């Protein structure tokens, strides 16, 4: 006779699923991340171009 198969608990064997966690952190959309990155790149380019003239 075959032995009964042991089953795992329905909670995913104790593994934490991060998308279930509710945090109070600042949430930013992917578009926001891209926009912020583009702004920082533009600022970096402007500072390299005009920084020596402005800051001596």
From Swiss-Prot:
Keywords: Cell membrane, Membrane, Protein transport, Translocation, Transmembrane, Transmembrane helix, Transport. It is found in: Cell membrane. The chain crosses the membrane at residues 30-51. Residues 1-29 are cytoplasmic. The keyword Protein transport applies. InterPro entries: Preprot_translocase_SecG, SecG/Sec61-beta/Sbh. One of its GO terms (biological process) is protein transport. Belongs to the SEC61-beta family. NCBIfam families: PRK01253.1. Involved in protein export. The function of the beta subunit is unknown, but it may be involved in stabilization of the trimeric complex. This is Preprotein translocase subunit SecG. It comes from Thermococcus onnurineus (strain NA1).
């Amino acid at each position: 006779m075959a032995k009964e198969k042991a089953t795992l608990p329905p909670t995913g064997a104790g593994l934490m699923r991060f998308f279930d966690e509710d945090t109070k952190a600042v949430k930013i959309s992917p578009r926001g991340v891209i926009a912020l990155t583009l702004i920082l790149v533009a600022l970096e380019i402007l500072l390299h171009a005009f920084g020596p003239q402005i800051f001596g």
